[in-house]
């Protein structure tokens, strides 16, 4: 059975977030502000249906999807690009591949111990974030 990612999660650490944002083409001022933020994730999981909210004082982002079903994702509030996304389970990792203007883009969420891990990747840049349950 896949992992249960449900809960409210607070950011503990972030590695190479600026490199990831640079690969997305996010402007200098936004990158500098975003690096200072400590976003909170709220994940609602009902079987293979997910709602993931990422909330910060700068921007909020909401995505809803069902595992195994391709969907159009509007990354308004992030890099303002649209892409076609497909989320699948790879063992206990929830993995998303995003096809669009940027190459080799996507993310993975998984739990180790009492922490939620997020790895975001785009055009060779990888950002690793760790969250603690609130």
UniProtKB/Swiss-Prot annotation:
Name of protein: Retinoid-binding protein 7
GO cellular component: cytoplasm
Nucleotide-binding is among the record's keywords: no
Alphabetical UniProt keywords: Cytoplasm, Retinol-binding, Transport, Vitamin A
Primary gene name: Rbp7
Function: Intracellular transport of retinol.
The keyword Cell membrane appears for this protein: no
Pfam families (alphabetical): Lipocalin
Reported tissue expression: Highly expressed in white adipose tissue and mammary gland.
UniProt note: domains: Forms a beta-barrel structure that accommodates hydrophobic ligands in its interior.
Subcellular location: Cytoplasm
GO molecular function: retinal binding; retinoid binding; retinol binding
InterPro entries noted in UniProt: Calycin, Fatty_acid-bd, ILBP, Lipocln_cytosolic_FA-bd_dom
Family: Belongs to the calycin superfamily. Fatty-acid binding protein (FABP) family.
């Amino acid at each position: 059975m896949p992992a249960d990612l449900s809960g409210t999660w607070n950011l503990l650490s972030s590695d190479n977030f600026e490199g990831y944002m640079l690969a997305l083409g996010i402007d200098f001022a936004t990158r500098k502000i975003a690096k200072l933020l400590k976003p909170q994730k709220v994940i609602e999981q009902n079987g293979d249906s997910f709602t993931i909210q990422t909330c910060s004082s700068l921007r909020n982002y909401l995505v809803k999807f069902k595992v195994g079903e391709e969907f159009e994702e509007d990354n308004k509030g992030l890099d303002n690009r649209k892409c076609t996304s497909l989320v699948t389970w790879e063992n206990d990792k929830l993995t998303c591949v995003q096809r669009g203007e940027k190459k080799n883009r996507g993310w993975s969420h998984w739990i180790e111990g009492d922490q939620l891990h997020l790895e975001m990747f785009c055009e060779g840049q990888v950002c690793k974030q760790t969250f603690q349950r609130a």
